[in-house]
């Protein structure tokens, strides 16, 4: 069996020391990241974390050799083009730092569109020339207006999930449209025996606090309903018992100095309701009387008209 090269042995040992020297070890994807972009990110987080690019197989071997509790599960995420990050910051904080460091970059061709790439109608800075045929060949409704190449109408240039061809990548660069998110993509992180994947780390602080508050209120409500006494619900239980006692006293017409104002308000409300009913009945009687008076007046008027007619007939 061939012995591994000494540089590989030394490199793996160096990775082991890195992992053991910090509380947190994370695996990040560097796929598609240009060297200048990588160096810029490395410099921006230098005071918080260290980054080492490694072959995935060597990184998996180093993770196995560290002996940290449960860290061996982290090697399942070491595939493809990856790097190791070690830090004393929390996994969530280092994830947020990496997300904020991401920038938009031009497509080179061959990338998958992260979302629909829509080009709006616009005037470009290009004069008439070979560019117009390049734009048209790539699928843009290009024309010449006032000595400039213009895009005549909105077009979905590349649909989400489609491959950005080299031809279209060049057009996008000409139009200064940068559709690629460039940065280190944190895949998973280890801390104190736990593995945190991207799905967990991507949850916002606001979402975490909202979920905790909802869970607390739900548990509190359940404890109150079940009469399960814990310190957090004692004030609520006292308030609930007081309100139930007040309600029972009112139903039983039991008056004391604590609830007499409730009985007074109740009596006032009842009196107001009775007064309203009486006024309604009186109004109804007035309306009936007026209708009867009008009917009598109408009958009298009819009788007088009839008598007048007969008088005129018989002279």
From Swiss-Prot:
InterPro entries (UniProt xref): Ribosomal_protein_uL10 (IPR050323), Ribosomal_uL10 (IPR001790), Ribosomal_uL10-like_insert (IPR040637), Ribosomal_uL10-like_insert_sf (IPR043164), Ribosomal_uL10-like_sf (IPR043141), Ribosomal_uL10_arc (IPR022909)
Keywords tagged on the record: Ribonucleoprotein, Ribosomal protein, RNA-binding, rRNA-binding
UniProt xrefs under Pfam families: Ribosomal_L10, RL10P_insert
Residue ranges, annotated region (Disordered): 287-315
Protein name: Large ribosomal subunit protein uL10
Family: Belongs to the universal ribosomal protein uL10 family.
Annotated function: Forms part of the ribosomal stalk, playing a central role in the interaction of the ribosome with GTP-bound translation factors.
Transmembrane segments: none
Comp. bias intervals (Basic and acidic residues): 287-301
SUPFAM superfamilies (alphabetical): Ribosomal protein L10-like (SSF160369)
A GO molecular-function descriptor: large ribosomal subunit rRNA binding
């Amino acid at each position: 069996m061939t012995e591994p090269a000494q540089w590989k042995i030394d490199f793996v040992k160096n990775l082991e020391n890195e992992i053991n020297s910090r509380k947190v070890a994370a695996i990040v994807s560097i796929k598609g990241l240009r060297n200048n972009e990588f160096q810029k990110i490395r410099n921006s987080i230098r005071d918080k974390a260290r980054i080492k690019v490694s072959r995935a197989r060597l990184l998996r071997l180093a993770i196995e050799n560290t002996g940290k509790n449960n860290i061996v599960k982290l090697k399942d995420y070491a595939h493809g083009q990856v790097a190791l990050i070690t830090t004393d910051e929390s996994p969530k904080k280092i994830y947020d730092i990496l997300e904020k460091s991401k920038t938009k970059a031009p497509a080179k061709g061959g990338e998958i569109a992260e979302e629909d790439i829509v080009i709006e109608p616009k005037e470009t800075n290009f004069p008439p020339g070979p560019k117009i045929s390049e734009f048209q060949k790539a699928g843009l409704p290009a024309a010449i207006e006032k000595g400039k190449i213009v895009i005549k109408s909105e077009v979905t240039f590349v649909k989400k999930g489609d491959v950005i061809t080299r031809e279209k990548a060049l057009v996008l660069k000409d139009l200064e449209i940068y559709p690629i998110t460039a940065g280190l993509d944190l895949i998973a992180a280890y801390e104190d025996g736990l593995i945190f994947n991207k799905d967990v780390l991507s949850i916002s602080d606001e979402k975490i606090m909202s979920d905790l508050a909802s869970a607390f209120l739900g548990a509190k409500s359940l404890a109150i309903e079940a009469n399960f006494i814990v310190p957090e619900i004692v004030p609520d239980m006292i308030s609930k018992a007081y309100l139930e006692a007040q309600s029972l006293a009112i139903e039983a017409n039991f008056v004391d100095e604590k609830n007499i104002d409730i009985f007074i308000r109740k009596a006032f409300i009842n009196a107001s309701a009775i007064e309203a009913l009486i006024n309604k009945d009186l109004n109804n009687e007035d309306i009936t009387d007026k209708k009867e008076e009008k009917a009598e007046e109408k009958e009298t008027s009819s009788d007088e008209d009839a008598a007048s007619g007969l008088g005129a007939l018989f002279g």
